[in-house]
Amino acid sequence: MKLLNSVQNEAILSNVGEVGEFRIRNSAKAFSILSSGLYSNKIRAIIRELSCNAVDSHIAAGNASTPYDIHLPNTLEPWFSIRDYGLGLTHDQVINLYTTYFESTKTDSNEFIGALGLGSKSPFSYIDNFTVTAIKDGRKGIYTAFINEHGIPSIALMMEEETTDPNGVEVRFAVDQRYDFDKFRSEARFVYEYFSLRPVVSEIGRAHV
């Protein structure tokens, strides 16, 4: 989503002393607020934010009518995942996007939903680590995003290989709390009620849109 430039206010100052600019300190507290504190309903936010990213990637790739895939957690397969078939990401793009808050590739067009560069980090509101699989032009990179010992979000390349899989990105994380299985299901129903293009949802070997 294209962000409007804020109005430039000209302050008229006279007889002032030293002027200091406001800054944000690179700290675990700041990252916790940006990753988790923004969301009151964390499961709903994760589904919404990652799905918006998937839709935007499909639009950018010219695949706006192609559904993306999600997997809802259950007893036999206790994880959540979302896999798009959009542009995919190179190694440098993964490192840049996932380690820079407010970094977005979508600030110059109104065709896209997102723009703030926060949604890709939303899984940190629920869990301390998740997996990102990025496929781009025959290269597959598998990464682990995690909170390090200092409380700072980090990402590491775990494996890299050639592939014939279509471009796209998959985000996956474990859901250890069984009582959250039903909540993921109900929140997905709520979120996708407002999406014109529904994903393909898989659950215990069954798939539906």
Give the positions of each predicted feature:
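Short amphipathic alpha-helical segments
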Residues: K42, I46, G86, T90-V94, ...
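Short N-terminal helix-initiation segments at or just after the protein's N-terminus
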Residues: E10-E21, H71-T75, E111-G119
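GHKL-type ATPase core
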Residues: S109-R206
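Conserved phosphate-chemistry cores used by DNA topoisomerases
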Residues: L34-C52, D69, N74, F80-R83, ...
